[in-house]
Amino acid sequence: MNVSKPEQRTLHALAQGGHIAFFRDASGKVTQVECYNRDGHLLLDCTLAVFARLKSKRLIHSSQGRPYRISMAGLKAVRPQADNR
């Protein structure tokens, strides 16, 4: 599956335990997203457009109104990266 660099960075942060917090307007449409890694730092590559592409490809999912997490399809699509921890 073709995954762009910003999508790849976002998926990698989610695969390590991060989440995507979302904010809705009065009509229920998602208007703003913030991607956090497992340490609580904000990832700037995660924009509303990246969020929409990941959601349309079903690489992320949310259940019961909780923050978005990586799905099993997302785990298979993410390429391994070196972790400099």
UniProtKB/Swiss-Prot annotation:
InterPro entries: YjhX_toxin. It comes from the Bacteria. Signal peptide: none annotated. NCBIfam families: PRK13687.1 (NF010240). Belongs to the UPF0386 family. This is UPF0386 protein PSPA7_4799.
